[in-house]
């Protein structure tokens, strides 16, 4: 095997009260990564969404950091060329950096037949997230690797719970700049016990709803975060207006990750109405998509 091409999905993290725990894989948008064996070194090339803004230096690129660590740990002597086609806009709140991290880990596992488990792939993938967010975290890379709905419940040791789900979501991507680091820095360092109780209860209810195929309950609780969303809502101009306008058209709505992307669980009969509201307020791209299966191999040579 000389070359492998992998599709790596966009993801939505937090989903309201599940801050830094919940993650959801999407069928679109997605990145594609081609990883090819070379004689030596790591070369990175990028095309697609905001490619000119993505560093190709190995130590500054999220995929490069992951690849370098894996190649060191497994004493891989050959080189590689990583070509990333960005279908996920960086800084979108849809796990753009995570897609690169997860995609390259998944590709190297296939290319060099490392036989790593999905949990081990999440662990390596999360290392690249430190470049984008300042610290390793797995709430996006976990669903990118596992697919479906994931809960990252511990980091030491790393524990990820996985629930396969069949849900359709409608995602808006406003043309607004939101820094992940800024969005994390504005969060409170301490919260009242009543807010903790609310979020723990709603998060637990969302898992219950998934097991009972109750979209109405899942969406209602997804919309009830009282810790993170109130801090970030004003970073996304028009969000509170949209939330009010679509409240009877969706089961739930919240900010995807750090934003600016907005994720909804739409009532099917109102998908067009919701899209029109998104376009009226933001004039932005909209994705109507299903929960995805995670990274997969598209081609092998």
Swiss-Prot record:
UniProt cross-references to Pfam families, sorted A to Z: GHMP_kinases_C (PF08544), GHMP_kinases_N (PF00288)
SUPFAM superfamilies reported in the protein's UniProt record: GHMP Kinase, C-terminal domain (SSF55060), Ribosomal protein S5 domain 2-like (SSF54211)
Binding site for ATP: 89-99
Keyword Lipid metabolism part of the UniProt annotation: no
UniProt keyword ATP-binding present: yes
MF-aspect GO terms: ATP binding; homoserine kinase activity
Catalytic activity: L-homoserine + ATP = O-phospho-L-homoserine + ADP + H(+)
Pathway: Amino-acid biosynthesis; L-threonine biosynthesis; L-threonine from L-aspartate: step 4/5
Entry EC number(s): 2.7.1.39
Entry keywords, A to Z: Amino-acid biosynthesis, ATP-binding, Cytoplasm, Kinase, Nucleotide-binding, Threonine biosynthesis, Transferase
Domain of life per record: Archaea
Coiled coil (residue ranges): none
Subcellular location field: Cytoplasm
Annotated Gene Ontology cellular component terms: cytoplasm
InterPro entries: GHMP_kinase_C_dom, GHMP_kinase_C_sf, GHMP_kinase_N_dom, GHMP_knse_ATP-bd_CS, Homoserine_kinase, Ribosomal_Su5_D2-typ_SF, Ribsml_uS5_D2-typ_fold_subgr
Enzymatic class: transferase
Single Gene Ontology BP annotation: threonine biosynthetic process
Protein role: Catalyzes the ATP-dependent phosphorylation of L-homoserine to L-homoserine phosphate.
Sequence similarity: Belongs to the GHMP kinase family. Homoserine kinase subfamily.
Record PANTHER family: HOMOSERINE KINASE (PTHR20861:SF1), HOMOSERINE/4-DIPHOSPHOCYTIDYL-2-C-METHYL-D-ERYTHRITOL KINASE (PTHR20861)
Name by which UniProt lists this protein: Homoserine kinase
Source organism: Methanococcus maripaludis (strain C6 / ATCC BAA-1332)
């Amino acid at each position: 095997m000389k070359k492998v091409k992998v599709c790596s999905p966009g993801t939505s993290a937090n989903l309201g009260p599940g801050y830094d725990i919940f993650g959801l894989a999407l069928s679109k948008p997605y990145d594609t990564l081609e990883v090819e064996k070379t004689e030596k070194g790591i070369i990175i090339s990028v095309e697609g969404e905001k490619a000119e803004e993505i560093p190709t230096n190995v130590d500054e690129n999220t995929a490069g950091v992951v690849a370098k660590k894996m190649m060191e740990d497994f004493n891989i002597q050959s080189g590689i060329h990583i070509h990333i086609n960005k279908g996920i806009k960086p800084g979108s709140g849809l796990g753009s950096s995570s897609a690169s991290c997860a995609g390259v880990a998944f590709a190297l596992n296939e290319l060099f037949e490392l036989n790593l488990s999905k949990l081990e792939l999440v662990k390596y993938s999360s290392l690249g997230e430190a470049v984008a967010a300042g610290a390793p975290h797995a709430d996006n890379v976990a669903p990118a690797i596992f697919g479906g709905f994931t809960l990252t419940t511990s980091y030491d040791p790393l524990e990820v719970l996985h629930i396969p789900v069949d849900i359709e979501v409608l995602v808006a991507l406003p043309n607004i700049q939101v820094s992940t680091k800024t969005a994390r820095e504005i969060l409170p360092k301490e919260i009242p016990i009543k807010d903790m109780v609310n979020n723990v209860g709603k998060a637990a209810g969302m898992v219950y709803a998934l097991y009972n195929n109750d979209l109405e309950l899942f969406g209602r609780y997804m919309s009830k975060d009282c810790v993170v969303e109130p801090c970030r809502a004003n970073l996304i101009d028009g969000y509170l207006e949209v939330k009010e306008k679509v409240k009877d058209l969706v089961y739930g709505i919240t900010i995807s990750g750090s934003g600016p992307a907005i994720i909804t669980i739409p009532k099917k009969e109102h998908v067009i109405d919701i899209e029109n509201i998104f376009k009226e307020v933001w004039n932005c791209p909209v994705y109507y998509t299903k929960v995805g299966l995670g990274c997969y191999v598209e081609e092998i040579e």
